[in-house]
């Protein structure tokens, strides 16, 4: 999604340079990111209540989100309604996952720790991006895409492992020895995804992209933040079993 979106932004700039009042600004990205995160958090409540008790519904939501994400990635730019609907679906999954994660460990305080860790991760990635190394890492899209696809395949295989009771209900993540390593890999990839999204937003703003791209960037940033939260929560839940 990141590579295609950045290419579309660059194409839009080449085809038609927007007027100054129609150019993307930092407040535009902040507002859309906050809106997408807010919708996701609100949607997490029914996800926590209604979806966590049925693994079949949760699995259906994951599959639906995958196809929804592919559809959204092909839209350029993403409209506000589409970004908010996608964020709501992501929030449902976040709520269901959160309930199941603390259910495994029985410690709701882990959610607070994961939220604090997510805030720290966002601040940390902003600090990393301010360095020359961080800017280079944010442009390593092809390497990230390859690793992300591999991690997605692992996630699909892990669903099968969960169905067979591997790792005490956590799949490969719950296997002693490699479980925490896989969790740490997930946290690292989510943080890298956030770094790439920060870089794309900065490039779009500096390049004078049209304001219509604010929802695409905000949705992408919010998705990476939610992903980072979920990976941190999984790491904490398994580490505290």
Specify the residue positions occupied by each region the protein language model found:
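A hydrophobic alpha-helical transmembrane-helix feature that marks the membrane cores
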Residues: 1-241
């Amino acid at each position: 999604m990141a590579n295609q979106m950045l290419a579309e932004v660059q194409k839009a700039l080449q085809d038609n340079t927007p007027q100054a009042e129609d150019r993307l600004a930092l407040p535009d990205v902040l507002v859309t990111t906050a809106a997408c995160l807010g919708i996701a958090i609100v949607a997490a409540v029914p996800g926590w209540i209604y979806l966590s008790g049925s693994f079949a519904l949760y699995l259906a939501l994951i599959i639906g989100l995958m196809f929804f994400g592919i559809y959204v990635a092909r839209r350029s730019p993403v409209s506000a309604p589409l970004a908010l609907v996608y964020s709501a679906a992501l929030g449902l999954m976040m709520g269901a996952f959160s309930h199941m994660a603390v259910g495994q460990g029985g410690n709701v305080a882990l959610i607070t720790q994961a939220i604090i860790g997510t805030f720290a991760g966002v601040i940390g990635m902003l600090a990393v991006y301010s360095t020359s190394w961080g800017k280079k890492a944010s442009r390593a899209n092809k390497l990230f895409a390859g690793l992300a696809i591999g991690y997605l395949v692992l996630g699909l295989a892990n669903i099968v492992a969960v169905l067979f009771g591997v790792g005490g209900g956590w799949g490969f993540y719950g296997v002693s020895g490699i479980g925490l390593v896989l969790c740490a890999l997930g946290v690292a990839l989510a943080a890298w995804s956030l770094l790439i999204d920060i870089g794309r937003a900065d490039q779009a703003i500096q390049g004078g992209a049209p304001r219509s791209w604010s929802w695409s960037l905000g949705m992408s940033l919010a998705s990476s933040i939610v992903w980072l939260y979920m990976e941190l929560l999984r790491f904490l839940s398994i580490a505290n079993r």
